[in-house]
């Protein structure tokens, strides 16, 4: 096996070994003409790429998760239907947002940038003699002019009297391609009056979002 050693003046150095297996033909790797910048990585350029020839270029490294945010309702809401429109706060217990974070106004949320987002909503409620409780995600892609139901989820609540508890959650991936016009909020619906629990120190009812990649 052939090797090239780039020797340091003190004796040791860096060794470049030949391939572990014999290629079907010679392979040409063309190095970049610049040194790149801090944080960049070497990648194969799309131009002039083939099974035996590749040009290398410096490119930005994958950013990973650049946005993470969490919100919750701070006080109880008792109703049979309506919108989770009031008493929202950004979670401040063992949490700090990553990136810019969501913006919220009267329960309507907006994303800070385009991307593929994981959205999770969870809720806890209790009622007296109710059969079901549900949460509906409403989404607008035209800056709030029109909303459509994107996800709707219900839980069965056993009719057994006072303080019959239930939980409803929503998980969805949202491909946000025009964040300036993308908005969402949550409705609730039940067979009778449900008390949806909220607390400034506990995530009884709330949401979190993660930007997991580019659109």
Model-derived regions, located:
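Extracellular repetitive beta-rich solenoid segments
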Residues: 1-65, 105, 112-114, 129, ...
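Extracellular jelly-roll beta-sandwich "head" domains, especially the C-terminal globular C1q domain
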Residues: 62-215
